[in-house]
């Protein structure tokens, strides 16, 4: 039986910049987040993931994107992207205790001009570069 993987990601912005993470053993940058645990709802998932990876309790805002894709192994994934409303709280994340810090190689604040970096998923890159990652009133459904 085929399973669908479910992940949640947080879009954290402050002062025109967006927070991205580079996981260990990866050569690209992604929005923080991870897989949903059994019994969790998507909001609980992103709250837990932000605490684990960055040591900050995120103020989860509205759902911005739903992204579906199949990876090279044919596994299907659905990702939920939420606005995180307390971006300033993440500015000093280095000093905070993280339970899963070993999973993160680097945390960076990027501007839309940082086009030389490999940002994923590619389907959000256009919105990021235009500065419209958290704009709009409706949920955007993306497929890649």
Predicted region positions:
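N-terminal strand-loop-strand
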Residues: 1-31, 58, 86
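Short, hydrophobic secondary-structure boundary micro-motifs
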Residues: 21, 92-94, 136-137
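Unchanged
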Residues: 36-59, 70-119
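A structural signal for short, well-ordered beta-strand segments
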Residues: 10, 63, 82-84
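Nudix hydrolase/Nudix homology domain
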Residues: 27-29, 99-144
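Short, well-ordered turn and helix-capping elements at secondary-structure junctions
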Residues: 25, 33-35, 67
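Short, solvent-exposed loop/turn elements at beta->coil junctions and helix N-caps
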Residues: 64-70
């Amino acid at each position: 039986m085929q399973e669908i993987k479910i992940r949640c990601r947080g879009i954290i912005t402050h002062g025109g910049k967006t927070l991205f993470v580079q996981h260990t053993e990866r050569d690209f940058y992604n929005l923080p987040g991870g897989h949903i645990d059994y019994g969790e709802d998507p909001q609980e998932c992103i709250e837990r993931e932000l605490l684990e990876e960055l040591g900050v309790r995120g103020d989860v805002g509205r759902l911005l994107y739903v992204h579906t894709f199949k990876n090279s192994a044919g596994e299907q994934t659905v990702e939920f992207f939420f606005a995180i409303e307390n971006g300033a709280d993440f500015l000093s994340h280095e000093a905070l205790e993280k339970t899963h810090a070993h999973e993160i190689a680097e945390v960076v604040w990027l501007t839309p001009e940082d086009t030389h970096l490999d940002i994923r998923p590619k389907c959000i890159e256009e919105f990021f570069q235009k500065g419209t990652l958290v704009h709009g009133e409706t949920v955007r459904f993306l497929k890649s």
